[in-house]
Amino acid sequence: MESYKKEFIEFMVDSNVLKFGEFTLKSGRKSPFFMNAGAYVTGAQLRQLGQYYAKAIYEHYGDDFDVLFGPAYKGIPLSVATTIAFSELYGKEIRYCSNRKEVKDHGDTGILLGSKINDGDKVVIIEDVTTSGKSIEETFPIIKAQADVEIVGLMVSLNRMERGLSSNASALDEIQEKYGFPANAIVTMEDVVECLYQKEYKGQILIDDERKKAIDAYYAEYGVK
């Protein structure tokens, strides 16, 4: 495993973002693990997170894009932190944009926060995690309703490696098939298991045999065939 992947997995654990237990996801699935980007709360955490995302986006999509779109609510700090990191690491000024859950009718009106989206813009979407592709069903129409844009791709931090909403393909593969743009992640759940299974980290084993059995059972039901 590449060293940066191991570092990022440990960063998620240290930030209390990656947890193990029993969780009900937005998709309705019961999962033995959960990733919550809302737990990144300090300046140091957000700075480091933005750098991980910026490096992954640069690796997969380069810097030929104009806007980084982070869907409300968790995508808002992700887009801000990553545009800052992009400027620091690569000297490229990317605009951030997010949506509001409710349209604002006074002052800075409309559905968007940050930059407006203009005809001809190239957009990268940034999210914490995509389980079933449901979130993109909500985000894609919002972006396309703003202007005639090209969506370059989607970047998430964790690929959960499970089926999407309507096929046996992974959620990320299903997004690419349905919407026509690539979807990538900093790390996969397979990377997480490889990194943590039966390996002590800071005095504890986060994935022991029992937890590995629960993860395997989850993928037997929801994993990519």
Predicted segment positions?
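Active-site-facing substrate-recognition patch
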Residues: M1-Y61
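PRPP-dependent phosphoribosyltransferase catalytic core
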Residues: E2-E10, P141, A145-K225
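Short glycine-rich phosphate-binding loop at a beta-alpha junction
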Residues: D63-K74
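Gly/Ser/Thr-rich loops at beta-strand to alpha-helix junctions
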Residues: A72-L78, S132
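Short, glycine/charge-rich flexible loops or terminal/linker lids adjacent to PRPP-binding catalytic cores
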Residues: V80-V123, E137
